[in-house]
């Protein structure tokens, strides 16, 4: 099953997440199919906190991909901002 989820990157105490489309059997930071955006929870000031390619997310959802709980919240936030 294909899932759209967060893959943690960044340094210790400085999380940075890639939003990826991956097979649910792969590890969270392992092999992925496509990168559709990023989420920076520690963004301050003029830094971009969220970038998401909504067209690609909608494409994958139409193909049967499921969203993780946190990614579903981020998609809702991105749709409000767009």
UniProtKB/Swiss-Prot annotation:
A GO molecular-function annotation: structural constituent of ribosome
Coiled-coil boundaries: none
A cellular component annotation (GO) from this entry: small ribosomal subunit
Pfam families tied to this protein: Ribosomal_S16
Keyword Ribonucleoprotein annotated: yes
GO biological process: translation
Keyword list, A-Z: Ribonucleoprotein, Ribosomal protein
Family the entry assigns: Belongs to the bacterial ribosomal protein bS16 family.
NCBIfam families: S16
HAMAP family: Ribosomal_bS16
Protein name according to UniProt: Small ribosomal subunit protein bS16
Gene name, Swiss-Prot/TrEMBL: rpsP
């Amino acid at each position: 099953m294909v899932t759209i989820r967060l893959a943690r990157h960044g340094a210790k105490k400085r999380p940075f997440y890639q939003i990826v489309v991956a097979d649910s059997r792969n590890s969270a930071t392992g092999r992925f199919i496509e990168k559709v955006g990023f989420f920076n929870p520690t963004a301050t000031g003029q830094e971009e906190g969220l970038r998401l390619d909504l067209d690609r997310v909608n494409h994958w959802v139409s193909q049967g991909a499921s969203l993780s709980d946190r990614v579903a919240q981020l998609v809702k936030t991105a749709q409000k901002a767009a």
